[in-house]
C-alpha cells in the first residue's frame, strides 16, 4: 500500500496513485499522504519524543517553528501523551511508545493510516486502548488499515475484514460480522 513492494498481478490504486505504474520519484509524495504505525515502533532512540515528531515535520516540509510546536502539542494531546515530549523512547513503556508512534503517524493529517500489528507487543489492556485510539482517529476522518492476528479485536471493533493469502486479498467481512437473529412469524388470519 505504501509502495514498498511491486504489484505482481491485478490492479492496485492508493490515493489516486496506480501502484502498478507508480514511478519511484512519486513514492515519497504518496507516503506523505499516509501515516504508518510500525509494530516495532521505529522511534529514533537518541532523540526525545518532541524531537522525533519535529524530525518528521521538518522532513515533510514544515518550517515555521511555532506551527511545528503547536502541531506536536496537538498530536501529543490527541494520544494522551502531552506530558511526555521531553522523554527519550527508552524511558517510555511499550504502550506509551506505541502512542507516540501513532502521534507521529497522524502529524500530517493523513488520509490513510497503515497500522502493522499495533497491539502485537502490548499487553491486552494496553492493546485495547491502542485500538480504541485508532478507532477514534478513524471516526475523525482518516481511514485506518490495521493488520492483526488478534481475532477478538475484529469482534470488538467491527469493520471490513480482509485476509491475505496466496498473494491475494480476499474480503472475509461476512465471517466476522455478528449474525443477525431473525424471527419468522407466521400470521394465519382467517377472514
Regions found by a protein language model. Give the residues of each.
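Helix N-cap at the start of a conserved alpha-helix in ABC-type nucleotide-binding domains
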Residues: 124-126
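Conserved ABC ATPase signature
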Residues: 88-92, 96-98
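Conserved signature/switch motifs of ABC ATPase nucleotide-binding domains
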Residues: 87-90, 108, 140
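Catalytic Walker B motif of ABC-type/P-loop ATPase nucleotide-binding domains
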Residues: 113-116
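Short coil-to-helix segment of the ABC ATPase nucleotide-binding domain corresponding to the Q-loop/switch region
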Residues: 47-55
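Helix-to-loop junction immediately C-terminal to a conserved catalytic motif
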Residues: 2
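Conserved ABC transporter NBD signature motif
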Residues: 10-18
Amino acid at each position: 500500500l505504501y509502495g514498498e513492494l511491486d504489484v505482481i498481478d491485478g490492479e492496485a490504486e492508493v490515493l489516486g496513485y496506480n501502484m502498478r505504474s507508480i514511478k519511484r520519484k512519486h513514492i515519497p509524495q504518496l507516503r506523505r499522504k499516509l501515516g504508518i504505525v510500525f509494530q516495532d515502533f521505529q522511534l529514533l532512540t537518541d532523540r526525545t519524543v518532541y524531537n522525533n515528531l519535529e524530525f518528521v515535520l521538518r522532513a515533510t516540509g514544515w518550517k515555521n517553528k511555532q506551527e511545528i510546536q503547536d502541531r506536536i502539542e496537538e498530536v501529543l494531546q490527541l494520544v494522551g501523551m502531552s506530558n511526555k515530549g521531553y522523554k527519550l523512547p527508552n524511558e517510555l513503556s511499550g504502550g506509551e511508545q506505541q502512542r507516540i508512534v501513532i502521534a507521529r503517524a497522524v502529524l500530517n493529517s493523513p488520509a490513510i493510516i497503515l497500522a502493522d500489528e499495533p497491539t502485537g507487543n502490548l499487553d491486552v489492556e494496553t492493546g485495547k486502548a491502542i485500538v480504541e485510539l485508532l478507532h477514534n482517529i478513524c471516526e475523525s476522518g482518516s481511514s485506518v488499515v490495521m493488520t492483526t492476528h488478534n481475532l477478538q479485536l475484529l469482534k470488538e471493533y467491527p469493520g471490513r475484514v480482509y485476509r491475505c493469502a496466496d498473494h491475494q486479498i480476499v474480503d472475509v467481512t461476512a465471517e466476522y460480522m455478528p449474525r443477525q437473529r431473525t424471527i419468522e412469524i407466521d400470521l394465519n388470519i382467517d377472514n
